[in-house]
Amino acid sequence: MLETGQSGKLLYRQVAELVHSRGVEKIIGVGEEIRTAAARFEIEKYFFRTTEELLESDLLAGLRNEVILVKGSRAFHFDRISDRLELKVHETILEINLNALVDNLNYYRSKLKPETKMVCMVKASAYGAGSYEIAKTLQDHRVDYLAVAVADEGSDLRKAGITCSIMIMNPELTAFKTMFDYKLEPEVYSFHLLNELIKAAEKEGVTNFPIHIKLDTGMHRLGFAPEEIPELIDRLKKQTAVIPRSVFSHLVGSDGAQFDSFTRRQIEMFEAASECLQEAFQHKILRHICNTAGIERYPGAQFDMVRLGIGLYGIDPFTNQIINNVSTLKTTILQIHEVPKEETVGYSRKGHLERDSRIAAIPIGYADGLNRRLGNGHAYCLVNGQKAPYVGNICMDVCMIDVTDIDCKEGDKAIIFGDDLPVTVLSEILETIPYEILTSVSNRVKRVITRINEKKNERKRHEKDEHTLLLRIFRKLLKIDSYETYILPFVMSLFLGVVICPENE
């Protein structure tokens, strides 16, 4: 765990209290110091002096139907534990690196004025990464708001223990009671929605419920038109059920230089309309229009708050390059066949072989989110760092890859996307956006949460930006913003069945 400056006795007392309060059923500890605190853990528990001792035991082989969080410094080589577990089950997993996510958060924070607040998007299961684990990490790093699409996403986070303010971007008319009960703040984009919300709040006896007013400045998807602001103000003034907490709009093309003039017009329109709304009320109404690309390209449009989306998950929407990779989709080779020249592979005999080949089957298919258009040699995965093209049609649960020129064996890993094969490569092949690929990874693919400390994919141009780098160092030295350490970073889920942790890092 992160260095806290506390004594081991006090620290592990706090660890034990949190483990017990979160319903963790089993703990596996590695290291001498945590072994001395064994009596504090009144649950099923196992302790080992070293990682090697744990690996040599039969404990990991006996784990069944359990959600496992592996947390530890690189000195403990806990990646060997993850490798052992993956090999045991031969499963396809989406590995989420929380340290990379925090690095991305800090990168964009370094672009902001100190007083600028931040909304972090965790809708669509945090872009496929897993809502709770991401939300908990962001809450620990003191973001101002989380944003989800629908009320059920927000209530699930509340039930899991998330206390941070939550914004609902697509509120349903049938979910107002849920929003009131769980303090979920809805976006309001039309008079119909506003009137129904006021009616529901008055029925429940709710007053001054915070809402977020959306303005349409050019997206033409949802939002009040600027000319509707006077009528909106009049409606809001005549009731006490709801109160505007923020007003915002959505930039259409902030990631494209060809749209710069349109983006500037949007910003000007928003500034004028939001000022009109603010002047009608005595309390402060937060204003926000910048998304990820806007943070980077329009620093003068930060207003009071910004919304961080795809950049949080490691993708720069302006350059389509990786900042720090967060998500790695990987699987293992199930079987390798020696297939003669002129034979075919897969359904409809689409995979025609022009040479004697070694064909490997891996347990991932279109039901897991692997797009069928990647088959028949249109894309590849990585096996032991080398390109292995997809052969034939991608099946529902399995696909085949050509490993003829690769030194590999059954049980070896295959990387679908990750550090060395960015998801942006696949999105370009498919002529789509990385969002679609990330959110298409199905729920049956297990999410494994890690905290890998190596910053392998730190953006080079970021390191060359002297001002940004100095600002990050300054903040780190003063331990402000999200650079503060926190005591118990490794208990990441209310639903954990097993926690594996070391002594102090």
Per-segment meaning from a language model:
Residues 95-97, 102, 110, 117, ...:
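Active-site anion/phosphate-binding pocket segments in diverse small-molecule metabolic enzymes
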Residues 1-103, 110, 145, 151:
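ATP-dependent carboxylate-amine ligase
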Residues 498-504:
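Short, intrinsically disordered C-terminal tails of secreted or membrane-associated proteins
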Residues 27, 70, 157, 247, ...:
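Residue-level signal for inorganic ion chemistry
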Residues 93-95, 102, 116-288, 302:
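Active-site-proximal beta-alpha core segment in soluble small-molecule metabolic enzymes
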